């Protein structure tokens, strides 16, 4: 199955082809969705996903790197110890929103300020990642989770690089960051500490702190895109010939905090 096939199955995108979906980027919006924490051990840190919306063609989907199955043997212990396989999944935005409304968890949307070329590259990357041979990955709380996967996918398909402008003099350890979210879940704390080992009390940099969804949300709000420059020809690479530009063009709660 591919992204295009999923869109054709779940929307009113009649008459569309793969080429038409990938090539018509002008009115497509790509957003980062940050979700509040839940009550289960696997949702204590919150969640991150990517929304791709094109109302004119009836497309509104969510790309989600947080899919898993409870059928995995010893799921909770494996999750706590970072030994769980996760999958990338795609769902409709309406279904995604309904789930978080039911669980009474807030969702914050940040619309990304991307060029048509960047949006096209991102959708093609999503399509590749959605192939059966690429869809599964080994989840890790700190270095390979739903938030870092979304961040890295976006960063890899930007015509330049993301500059994080978050000014901070605080560099908490992984242990401190985790315990701020797991104070009432001792087994989760134990598993996190065991997984980190000697790294647990080392100070973290901005990139490492972004394993927490709310930290990435904050950093995206202040981030800019530094456009690539061809120094030999003294030309700017990118459709808008503008550098820097804000990474986020608009942000709002689509489900408010309860």
Where is each model-derived feature located?
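Bacterial Sec-dependent N-terminal signal peptides
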Residues: 1-19
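Soluble extramembrane regions of membrane proteins in the secretory/endomembrane system
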Residues: 16-258
């Amino acid at each position: 199955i591919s992204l295009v096939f999923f869109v054709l199955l779940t929307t009113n995108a009649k008459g569309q082809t793969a080429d038409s979906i990938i090539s018509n980027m002008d009115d497509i919006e790509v957003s980062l969705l940050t979700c509040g924490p839940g009550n289960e051990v696997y949702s204590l840190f919150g969640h991150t996903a990517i929304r791709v919306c094109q109302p004119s063609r009836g497309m509104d989907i969510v790309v989600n790197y947080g899919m898993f199955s409870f059928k995995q043997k010893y799921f909770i212990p494996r999750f706590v110890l970072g030994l769980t396989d996760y999958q990338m999944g795609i769902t409709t935005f309406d279904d995604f929103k309904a789930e978080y409304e039911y669980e009474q968890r807030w969702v914050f949307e940040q619309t990304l300020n991307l060029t048509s070329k960047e949006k096209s590259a991102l959708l093609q990357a999503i399509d590749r990642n959605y192939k059966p041979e690429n869809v599964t990955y080994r989840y890790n709380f700190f270095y390979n989770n739903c938030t870092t996967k979304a961040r890295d996918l976006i960063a890899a398909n930007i015509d330049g690089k993301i500059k994080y402008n978050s000014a901070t003099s605080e560099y908490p350890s992984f242990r401190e960051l985790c315990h701020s979210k797991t104070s009432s879940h001792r087994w989760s704390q134990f598993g996190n500490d065991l997984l980190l080992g000697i790294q647990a009390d080392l100070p973290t940099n901005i990139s490492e702190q972004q394993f927490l969804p709310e930290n990435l949300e904050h950093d995206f709000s202040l981030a800019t895109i530094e456009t690539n420059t061809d120094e030999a020809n003294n030309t700017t690479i990118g459709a808008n010939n503008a550098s820097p530009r804000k990474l986020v063009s608009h942000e709002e709660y689509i489900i408010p905090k309860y």
